[in-house]
Amino acid sequence: MKQISGNKLFVKALKEEGVDVLFGYPGACTIDISDELYKQSDIDIILPRHEQALVHEADAYARTTGKVGVCLVTSGPGATNLVTGLATANYDSVPLVCFTGQ
């Protein structure tokens, strides 16, 4: 049986779900996933200056395209900086998925 790393499996799953844009802010806990994302060209990576901007950009992307907004941030403050944007998307039933490091 062929083995595949969790990073490759994560990126493969995103592609299979039709994700073509990801809003991400790399950090220590997600650096391996970020490295895997940068090796491919099917998913465009938007790198903002702050996680709060990232989640609101993903929300706007979902609202304007009808596609799911996908976020990837590191643990700790990276994750907590998503809260307001997640609440906004949840309140308005906007399709938004956020992944954080552990």
Model-derived segments and their meaning:
Residues M1-Q102:
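N-terminal alpha/beta PP-like core and its mobile active-site loop of ThDP/TPP-dependent enzymes
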